[in-house]
């Protein structure tokens, strides 16, 4: 996410982007960024990814992968790290459910 003036409001970016990540075996996996947002309570940026080409299951659901986006000093890059707390998981679930309903 590019540099933002974070205030007390939830900031959401729905621009899709493709990212290449590596799985546990070191294989490249292509993901589509489906949602990106900053949450003022946690003071973190989050990205929600879906594996490119993933098919929905019998309940019409696609597995989403939430990550924390830790930007580097330049703001041009950074790293994605796993979600840290149950509170973050709950917040992410609420944001994703709200965004997917719209």
From Swiss-Prot:
Pfam families: DUF1292 (PF06949). It comes from the Bacteria. InterPro entries: UPF0473 (IPR009711). Coiled coil: none annotated. Belongs to the UPF0473 family. This is UPF0473 protein SAOUHSC_01719. It comes from Staphylococcus aureus (strain NCTC 8325 / PS 47). The lineage of its organism: Bacteria, Bacillati, Bacillota, Bacilli, Bacillales.
């Amino acid at each position: 996410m590019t540099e933002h003036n974070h205030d007390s409001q939830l900031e959401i970016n729905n621009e899709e982007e493709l990212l290449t990540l590596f799985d546990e075996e070191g294989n490249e996996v292509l993901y589509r960024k489906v949602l990106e947002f900053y949450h003022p309570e946690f003071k973190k940026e989050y990205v929600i990814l879906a594996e490119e080409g993933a098919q929905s299951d019998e309940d019409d659901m696609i597995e989403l992968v939430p990550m924390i986006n830790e930007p580097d000093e330049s703001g041009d890059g950074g790293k994605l790290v796993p979600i840290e707390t149950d509170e973050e998981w709950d917040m992410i679930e609420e944001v994703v459910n709200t965004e997917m309903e719209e």
